Amino acid sequence: MTDYDVIVIGGGHAGCEAASASARLGARTVLITHKMDTIGVMSCNPAIGGLGKGHLVREIDALDGLMGRVADAAGIQFRLLNRRKGPAVRGPRTQADRKLYREAMQREISGIENLSVIEGDAFDLLTEDGVVCGTAMKDGRIFRAAAVVLTTGTFLKGLIHIGQRKIPAGRVGEEPSLGLSGTLRRFGLQLGRLKTGTPARLDGRTIDWDRVGRQGPDENPVPFSFMTDAIINRQIDCGVTRTTDATHKIIADNIHQSAMYSGQIEGVGPRYCPSIEDKIVRFGERDGHQIFLEPEGLDDDTVYPNGISTSLPEDVQDAFIRTIPGLEQVKILQPGYAIEYDHVDPRELELSLGVRKMPGLFLAGQINGTTGYEEAGAQGLVAGLNAALRSIGRAPHFFSRTDSYIGVMIDDLTSRGITEPYRMFTSRAEYRLSLRADNADMRLTPAGITLGCVGDARRQRFEAWKHSYETGRTLLQSLSVTPSEGKRFGLKLNQDGQRRTAFDILSYPDQSIAALKPLWPELQTIPAGVVEALEIDAAYAVYMERQATDIAGVRRDENTSIPDDFDYEVLPGLSNELKQKLAQHKPRNLAQAMKVDGVTPAAISLILSWLRRQVRQAQRVGG
């Protein structure tokens, strides 16, 4: 029997971030995975980031997590999505070389102090007096710890479907995790089934690249990580093609052979990453669906056809793929498949990602009903931090939907639950003007420094950057001009006699620090590394001031906790229906109570009144 502070089960994106975060806080951590050489494997698409997802990667990085640095080390086609739109909704993304990503992640994991990696199959969880305290391995080994983090991905009772063929697996060639699913049911947790899918892998040497379009990388790649100075990998194009009427006919004629449409699959798939069968059934009026042909590596001929995930039989896959321009002679290296797996209802979780019914147990990733590497990594970081905090007797750290996309995601999951795999979008955040990808470090790194999860190198670099930023902002706010003075330098200002600072003027369309230098030569002293941040903050300053009151109100409601044992039955004036709904949902604070269907402002006032009464009674007893 071996003792640790924290045990992390699963070596995928959530598990790596959880183990790293726990170890960075100083907890003796062990990462248990089926195979060490699969740590960092990208099971589905070879890409990191995107709309909403890129924000999560930046936030992971701001807390000194791994994904951003690893993506920078492996990225082979960087693109900033929504570049023409406002900074709040821009999404950094890169295609990644699978081999480079895996190698970079394994290097990171192997270099972390306080972290051990063990191969094996965690079969059961150990408990004492209702508290999780370790894991039992299939081979008989026992590991004990103050906290356990489960990051099982699609391995929890995983089942692959290719046509009518079923293969128990967590992914191709790897056995599922069966014992832990039974353990969670034994604990009384509410489990469900979800489904995801992946397309066939193609031999790039058999693609007619002259018949497909091309999409290139950005000329100046923007890294994910604050710690990355430059992208060094060669950047490549990907191909672009479309399905045809012939493609659609083959799929429609064989839809009964799809595992998803034959009744073979119980689980619900991701709405925003539909299979090609779903696209044909739901959007049959379209004459074609776009496909991105994404090379899987700089020295790898494998191509990932993004947009045609499927669970049709192999012969049907071969037939419909060959109707796509450029793929007429293509060779399939691995068929596409759907995979079904167990997940836990995320409403079973605290905001710390700890399980309410089983203290000491934390869950992260697809086990919580999410989809995507980025969502998994962000949850892993939160679960790992809070598991480590528990192990050293510190209070958990909660992320707010007012300070991060991480907070938005966790609040959505724990308060609303899921009916399909959850994916992050910028539209999920009410305060997205504040929660931009470009300001993730300013928002979260100070909290990470306080927590102790940010290393010295990042802290020093961040503090130097912040000093430059604050010096530059002070300078911009100290320089001012009248409308008539500005007019002499070509500035179009309202002729109202009011002085405006350089910072104010930057909020005007088409203004920049460079354009203001003829008027104020001292602006040349502002370091290039903070110019864009200052320009964006100036552009959003008025809107941020308006949001500040709303954000303060939400934070106040989030900080008003509702005890787990709060008795809604004693509240006079609350309908029986609302009493039942609130007792079922068990909102953790007033902000979550407001989201319960049917809850009115009057009901919130009533709850708040009773909470205050309980506080006064407790104070009288204590006094």
Swiss-Prot record:
NAD(+) binds at residues 269-283. The keyword Flavoprotein applies. Signal peptide: none annotated. Its cofactor is FAD. Keywords: Cytoplasm, FAD, Flavoprotein, NAD, tRNA processing. InterPro entries: FAD/NAD-bd_sf, GIDA_C_N, MnmG, MnmG-rel, MnmG-rel_CS, MnmG_C, MnmG_C_subdom, MnmG_C_subdom_sf. Transmembrane segments: none annotated. SMART domains: GIDA_assoc_3. NAD-binding protein involved in the addition of a carboxymethylaminomethyl (cmnm) group at the wobble position (U34) of certain tRNAs, forming tRNA-cmnm(5)s(2)U34. This is tRNA uridine 5-carboxymethylaminomethyl modification enzyme MnmG. It comes from Rhizobium meliloti (strain 1021). The gene is mnmG.
